């Protein structure tokens, strides 16, 4: 409320400040700030690119980073026997025959990418051990932390990454999910298929960066020159 003095009367006349105009402008400013904040938050979220689609593999920089040993790849175990009607490879706590073929396909793809500067570690569970064997073509060492899917998983990954050597982990969807959460990957993108590979840049100089993922089938569709 404002008060205006009226000459000749000795009286004050009450009036109202134009709150409607002020409020309208204030709302626009507040709305703009909210929109800008939401946009910044959206753009800051890590995205998991489909490296088997279009030019995503080339634009990710994965190949060059792999040559320098600056990549961590987390691979979910192949199809579980106890959750599938397909024929089991062996015991019920392992993978299926179809899963072993998928793991072999992933292994062939990694061979084309190059395993000279790579270190493989698997979770000790049967399904991850079998998957790792078919990926590598031989027995792979196991360590408990690779199967401990909790909030400390990312720190364990960072701590076990050696400079100049790619790290390949045969693990579980829960572990990959925990890692993605700490990287800011939105819930709708935090999923991994059987034998899907999730790639992260980890060079020891900058913060880890999500590069993208490849499922088991996509490895076959990649030409040799795309992996060199």
What are these regions (language model features)?
Residues 71-72, 163-171:
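Generic beta-sheet signal
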Residues 155:
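Flexible acidic/His/Gly-enriched loops in nucleotide-sugar-dependent glycosyltransferase catalytic domains
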Residues 2-144, 149-152, 160, 176-178, ...:
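Active-site-proximal alpha-helix that buttresses catalytic centers in soluble enzyme cores
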């Amino acid at each position: 409320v404002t008060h205006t003095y009226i000459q000749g009367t000795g009286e004050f006349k009450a009036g109202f400040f134009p709150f409607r105009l002020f409020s309208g402008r204030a709302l626009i400013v507040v709305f703009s700030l909210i929109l800008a904040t939401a946009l910044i938050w959206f753009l800051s979220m890590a995205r998991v690119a489909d490296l088997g689609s279009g030019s995503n593999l080339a634009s990710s920089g994965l190949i060059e980073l792999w040559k320098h040993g600056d990549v961590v790849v987390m691979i979910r175990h192949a199809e579980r026997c106890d959750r599938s009607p397909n024929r089991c490879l062996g015991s019920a706590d392992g993978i299926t025959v179809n899963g072993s073929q998928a793991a072999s396909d992933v292994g062939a793809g990694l061979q084309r990418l190059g395993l000279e500067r790579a270190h493989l570690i698997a979770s000790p569970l049967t399904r991850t051990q079998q998957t790792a064997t078919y990926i590598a073509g031989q027995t792979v060492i196991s360590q408990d932390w690779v199967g401990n899917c909790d909030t400390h998983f990312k720190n364990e990954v960072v701590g076990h990454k050696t400079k100049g050597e790619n790290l390949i982990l045969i693990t579980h969807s829960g572990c990959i999910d925990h890692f993605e959460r700490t990287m800011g990957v939105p819930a709708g993108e935090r999923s991994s298929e059987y034998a899907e590979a999730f790639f992260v840049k980890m060079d020891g100089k900058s913060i880890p960066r999500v590069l993208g993922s490849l499922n088991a089938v996509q490895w076959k569709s990649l030409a040799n020159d795309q992996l060199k």
